């Protein structure tokens, strides 16, 4: 069974939907993101300890602070490549960013290969089922372009600003993905 709970965010953000298998956090999405409906099918609302823990994390985060803990989560269908990307995203400090290319270089170095596709990294970043907590919003284009966020570019900009990033380093392209 999949359980769901809704989190009311500050006004500059879309609200958030949280999924659980009853024990672990299994999904966290902005309510109006492109895949929202598929995460609401066959879900039951229920008060769960994992929802309480996740809401505590979100409350701290949306107050502009690094929560300092991570709710226990489980990701289904996690390939080794996706795990590498998620592990790197989990190590991007609060208030900092990496580029898709930075991540591809880290993976290539770890694997002992010359190159890794930044586009493949983008696919793995976009696949992330637990936004914010696994900070895919901290991954940006090489030139500072803010594209590729399934939660919507408005939310990505607001998340980076909340973390006190220097927003002069970034721009929203006129055309691109996830605008």
Where are these regions (language model features)?
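Basic nucleic-acid-binding alpha-helical/helix-turn surface characteristic of O6-alkylguanine DNA
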Residues: 1-112, 116, 162, 166-179
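Short glycine/serine-rich loop segments
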Residues: 116-158
């Amino acid at each position: 069974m999949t359980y769901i709970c809704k989190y009311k965010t500050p006004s500059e953000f879309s609200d958030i939907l949280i999924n659980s298998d009853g024990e672990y956090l299994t999904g966290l999405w902005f309510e109006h993101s492109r895949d929202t409906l598929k995460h609401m099918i066959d879900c039951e609302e229920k008060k769960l300890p994992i929802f309480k823990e996740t809401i505590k994390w979100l409350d701290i985060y949306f107050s502009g602070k690094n929560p300092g803990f991570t709710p226990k989560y489980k990701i289904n269908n996690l390939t080794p490549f996706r795990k590498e990307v998620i592990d790197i995203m989990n190590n991007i400090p609060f208030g900092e960013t990496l580029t898709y290319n930075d991540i591809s270089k880290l993976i290539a170095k770890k694997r002992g290969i010359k190159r890794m596709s930044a586009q493949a990294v983008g696919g793995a970043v976009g696949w992330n089922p637990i936004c914010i907590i696994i900070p895919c919003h901290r991954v940006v284009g090489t030139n500072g372009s803010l594209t590729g966020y399934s939660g919507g570019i408005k939310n990505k900009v607001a998340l980076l600003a909340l973390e006190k990033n220097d927003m002069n380093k970034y721009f929203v392209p006129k055309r691109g993905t996830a605008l």
